[in-house]
Structures are given as structure tokens and as C-alpha cells.
Amino acid sequence: MSPLCAQGHYGGFIGEKYENLSQYAAMVTQKRAKGADFIKIMISGLMDFDRFGVLTEDGLPPETIRELIHIAHEEGFAVMAHANGARTVEAAALAGVDSVEHGAYLDTDALHAMRENGTVWVPTLSTIGNLRGTGRFDEAAVAAILESAMENVAAFAAMGGLIAPGTDAGAWAVPHGSLSEYALLEQVLGENAENILSRGAAEIQRKF
């Protein structure tokens, strides 16, 4: 099933586009009729890998994020969100999103919101780490983005947050079957990596 994205915002190249919440709600209902297992929403841009700290676009308004998640939950779906940026991720967590994919440039408030609301974070470090040395993007920017993400993963783990492995396979430099995500997460989480990731993966399985 394709992710759902707002018309004119990031995700249109891969997802199904809606123009307003009424149309989104109708699409969610259609997903239920077609036997979908969950809903994925696109609520922010992605990282500009040439400029540290920059996203290709801001996230959707918090009230919109809240409604998107509420509508899907009312239909009985778990919701995963492509989300970057502290305020966007915080809004999604406070609205009860089940998992956050990517989650670049988070701060303490966003991390606490995810932990307190039981959000599983799938940080997809390999989408950043695998860009190193390819020459496609600014190497200093890529290194800084990865360092920031790894620091946040370590902080979230220290809080007792739920972290699950996920590669975003099919993204540039992230081939199917790659184990680079595990290597990066193990680098961050150390000897506790297996226990932390098993706990997060079990929660993903329970939710989805």
C-alpha cells in the first residue's frame, strides 16, 4: 500500500495524494476496504544532505498531523509517519502516532514526547551513513547529519525509548538485504544493542 501525502508536499512521487482532510478520510476508508494493515503518512520533507540542519520543507501543521493520525486510528489502523524535524515529530508523538520513520534533527522535547507516548522510532541511520564516500553530497554535511542522528539515538535509548531497526530499503545507497543499519545501530547502542532493538521490534510487531 502506498503512503498518503498532502497535495503539493513531499511524497507525491511515491504516495497517493489528498487535497484535504475529507479526501484523506475517504482514502483511509478505501484502504480498509482493500484490506490494508496500516497507514503510512508523509508529514515532512527530508534532509538536505548538502546542508546540515536543513529540511527540504517544513512539516505539516500540528493540528493537521493530529487529525491525520486520529482519522486513521478511528478506522482501526496503526499509523507510521515519515517525519523529520523536532516539532513535527513531537506533534506526531503527542497525537499518538505508532512509529516515526527517520526523525532527523530532534531535540529533548521531541525525544521525551516519543518516549512518554510509546512511539517506536525507526531512525534509518543507513540512509545517511551509506552516503559517506559516495561523492554525491557534501561529505562534511553528511557526517554532521549522521553524528546528530546517532547522538539522538543514544539519548533516546538512555531514556528507555523504543527503537527498532529499519533500513528504508530502496532509497539511494540502501540496497535490499543490506546489514548496514544494524552495524550503525550497534555502533551507537553498544553491548545493549540486541536487547534494545529486540524490544523495539517486538513493539512494532505488536502495534502493526
Stretches found by the model and what they are:
Residues 68-80:
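Short beta-strand/loop segments at the ligand-binding rim of alpha/beta enzyme cores
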Residues 94-99, 115-121, 160-162, 189:
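Glycine-enriched alpha-helix->loop->beta-strand junction motifs that scaffold or abut catalytic
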Residues 5-6, 45-50, 84-90, 105-108, ...:
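Active-site environment of divalent metal-dependent phosphoester hydrolases
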Residues 1-53, 57-71, 119-124:
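Divalent-metal coordination cores built from histidine and acidic residues
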Residues 74, 137, 146-208:
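His/Asp/Glu-enriched, well-ordered alpha-helical/loop segment
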Residues 1, 39-41, 79-81, 100-101, ...:
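Hydrophobic faces of well-ordered beta-strands that scaffold small-molecule active sites
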Residues 57-62, 66, 92-105, 173-188:
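Short, electropositive alpha-helical surface patch
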